[in-house]
Design a protein with these regions (language model features):
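Flexible low-complexity loop/turn motifs enriched in small/helix-breaking residues
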Residues: 20-115, 120-123
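A generic structural micro-environment signature
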Residues: 7-9, 73, 137
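Exposed boundary/loop context
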Residues: 10-14, 119, 130
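Sec-dependent N-terminal signal peptides of Gram-positive bacterial secreted proteins and lipoproteins
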Residues: 2-25
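Short beta-strand edge/turn micro-motifs at domain boundaries
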Residues: 125-147
Length: 147
């Protein structure tokens, strides 16, 4: 093969290799969150999924944290005692008392570098999420933490 042909073939391979990466989008999907819906006579899976979306949106604001699992806390969490307690918490956005509550516990991993209140590169388990709504309305995050 003469030098011109070798150069032309090499150049063509180089150009095609460079163009091959153009237009590619990041196809890596976010990690799947393991969901345990448990058994409920109060809430449908659709009700729970709506609450889960609120939780996932909140965790998405926690830079570097990765949500691993959520587990429904059971129908007993929607007790009159808990409704009274949670309605007693001051929420700026709350315009009327909540009539329903739902509880989830979660596991998540903190960022590799220490940020906010979380220890660096640590798996946290059992963080509770309390959400409330009025008469089947939209779920609102009332509080989260360890209880």
């Amino acid at each position: 093969m003469d030098m011109k042909k070798l150069l032309a073939v090499s150049l063509t391979i180089m150009i095609l290799g460079t163009l091959g990466g153009c237009g590619k989008q990041d196809t890596q999907e976010p990690p799947k969150v393991k969901i345990d819906y448990g058994n409920s006579e109060l809430y449908t899976q659709e009700d729970m999924d709506a609450a889960i979306q609120v939780i996932e949106a909140e965790v998405a604001t926690w830079e570097g944290c990765e949500l691993h699992s959520l587990a429904y806390g059971g129908d007993a969490a929607c007790s009159d005692e808990n409704i009274e307690w949670l309605n007693g918490l001051e929420m700026k956005e709350q315009t009327e008392p909540f009539t329903q509550y739902i509880l989830f516990s979660s596991s998540f991993h903190s960022p590799v570098e220490q940020r906010d209140a979380w220890d660096a590169d640590t798996e946290y388990e059992g963080l509770q999420w309390w959400l409330g709504r009025s008469d089947g309305g939209a779920w609102e995050l009332v509080t989260c933490g360890y209880g």
